[in-house]
Amino acid sequence: MELHNDEKRLLKAFKDSAKNIIDSEGLLEYIEKEKIMRAAFWLTGRDFLNIIEKKSKFLELTELGKNAIESGFPERKVSNYLKTNKLDSFPIKDLSKVLEKDEAGAALGNLKKKELVTIEKGNIFFKSLEYKDLEEELLKKVSLYPNLEEYSKEEILTIETLKKRGFLKLNEVTEREFEITVKGLEYIKNPIEIKEEVTQITRDLIVSGKWKEVSIRPYDAKIPTEEIYPAKAHPMSKIIEEVTEVLTSMGFSEVKSQIVQTEFWNFDTLFEPQDHPARDMQDTFFVKYPDTGIVPHELLKKVKSIHECGKIENEKISKGWCYKFDEEVSKRTVLRTHTTVSSIKYLSSLSNEEKENFHKVFCIDRVFRNETIDYKHLPEFYQCEGIIMAEDVSFNNLVGILKEFLSKLGFEKVRIRPAYFPFTEPSLEAEVYMEGKGWLELLGAGIFRPEVLEPFGIKKPVLAWGIGLSRLAMLRLGLTDIRELHKNDIEWLKKTVVIEK
């Protein structure tokens, strides 16, 4: 194995010193400082070396801190003024005569906080002019002993106060040591020969004939290099982009709707009763302003009739929910709790002629639930849903489409089990199999109930399904906590693989 000259120089330091661990200073005799880390990184990639990093935190006095040690804290200046002038009190309004403008307010606040003074009729009275100040003493100590590790928990609390006052700042220093491995020790048992190398054959080398004498370093495409993290899209954005591409390739068109919806569109049109638990404040975000919205009057009458008695004009669809429907509730505004509202609005917009055609649409967007934040719940997340409206589609078609969709997302093993949703019948849940995790629920689906479709004058079956994209992202990225998707952890974002199937 041929090593770079810088790698050889670094290993020679271990050979000559017979040490297993050497710090950066110990290598300077053999290799230039700016080349140490590059050579060490290469040797680490060859398993010849380990890099040991130790991070230390050191405190540093700011200009304010240095002035405080030389001239005293602002509160000490006040007490010294009283001692010098043999006064027992001092008017608050005259603080600016003793202190700088930016010191006066802080001095008074700290005198009261430290319980060194009492305030009477606008005058400051010191309990004792000969007082001890822990902050002053600690600041002097820090000027002599800056290593943070040398301080107790109580002292660190005081240090935090000194930092807030602008007297101190914290610096982090990384110290590195280099440890040779067993493989590296085997290598240095042999003589280490360092030849003059050239990386580029120049005209002068050719003309002079020196190219015959020098060692030309071979180009090694496999040599370890520093990792580079180029700019890339957020993993959640890539998931959304991928799902959009999959659905578009399957013949779906994308539709959108507003974030703020009336309860009519969000709940009533989906045949969800007005006393359903999902519609209370524990699950839904109600909008304060505007708190009501416009509802299409004729459609409202039809939906109301469906809810109350299951009828559209004289046509009996079902029993309905058998309760008194409140039109004012329908007008209240909410943050949408699902993207199905986009499909419902799309269906309601179809003309009689358009209802005769074949329709495949989907929506990917943010939805909102009044959830308690934990490892699997957020109040805001992305959802994807879609519908297919056609004359002869059936439950079997729905299962086939879902399996194709999940297969294109990389899930080969899919199983279907029965489920219940208020606005579809029959309904199903699809589970996918993941190695090491078993079967996991991923999406819900079904066929829209007649009570949902009849108010729009739609007689054809409509297949519907929905999937939480945050759940999909967790499975694909191997996350156990949904909050990790939105932490903006730069290290995680840099190292996360842009989605692979």
Curated annotation (Swiss-Prot):
L-phenylalanine binds at T340, F423, F448. One of its GO terms (molecular function) is tRNA binding. Gene3D superfamilies: Bira Bifunctional Protein, Domain 2 (3.30.930.10). Its main location: cytoplasm. It is found in: Cytoplasm. GO terms for cellular component: cytoplasm. Keywords: Aminoacyl-tRNA synthetase, ATP-binding, Cytoplasm, Ligase, Magnesium, Metal-binding, Nucleotide-binding, Protein biosynthesis. One of its GO terms (biological process) is phenylalanyl-tRNA aminoacylation. InterPro entries: aa-tRNA-synth_II, aa-tRNA-synth_II/BPL/LPL, Phe-tRNA-synth_IIc_asu, Phe_tRNA_ligase_alpha_bac/arc, Phenylalanyl-tRNA_Synthase. Binds 2 magnesium ions per tetramer. It is an enzyme of class 6 (ligase). It catalyses: tRNA(Phe) + L-phenylalanine + ATP = L-phenylalanyl-tRNA(Phe) + AMP + diphosphate + H(+). CDD domains: PheRS_alpha_core. Its EC number is 6.1.1.20. Its cofactor is Mg(2+). Pfam families: tRNA-synt_2d. Tetramer of two alpha and two beta subunits. Belongs to the class-II aminoacyl-tRNA synthetase family. Phe-tRNA synthetase alpha subunit type 2 subfamily. This is Phenylalanine--tRNA ligase alpha subunit. It comes from Methanococcus vannielii (strain ATCC 35089 / DSM 1224 / JCM 13029 / OCM 148 / SB).
